[in-house]
Amino acid sequence: MNKEKLIFIHIPKTAGTSIKKLFLNDNDFSLLTNLKKHEPIYNIKKNNINDYNKYKKFAIVRNPYDRIVSSYFFLQKMNIKNFFQTIEFNEWIKNPCKHPCKLLPGLTKYLLLAPQYLWIDETVNILKYENLNKELNTFLNKKVNLPKINNSIHEHYLNYYNNKSLNIIYHRYKEDFKKFNYKKL
């Protein structure tokens, strides 16, 4: 039986670790493995020019409001120099890259907090985080159970925002809202 060849574009904070774990244990699919973690599609295309068109590509996108709360708690979990003991979410939103993401080795502001549309192109199939199991089953044409890994523990994302921070995130990620049909709050 031929394995289906896949390229997974791992946008940060969109269940990528769970996806990779799923494919490590599935013999029906061949995931292109020479990729760096969180590599955007234009690099993948450039570095795999001979194989690129032989693979089915996909990425997962997430509601930007939810993704940013998840990023905040991820950075908080890293406990960067006790930074998060002093900065509240709505304060951090004003300029998140001015703060912790510059302090993490190997993690830049363009990675963790970059708009999702920058990771993909028109050749990439988009699955939504909010309906991931269902969309993944449809995309793979196979019933799979996605493991939950790296989940941050926090309240519903809307509990963290005020009107000003909702507006900041909408304008910062406006293209993601439009391209992936997420609603402005």
Model features per residue range: what roles?
Residues 1-185:
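Membrane-interface amphipathic segments in extracytoplasmic regions
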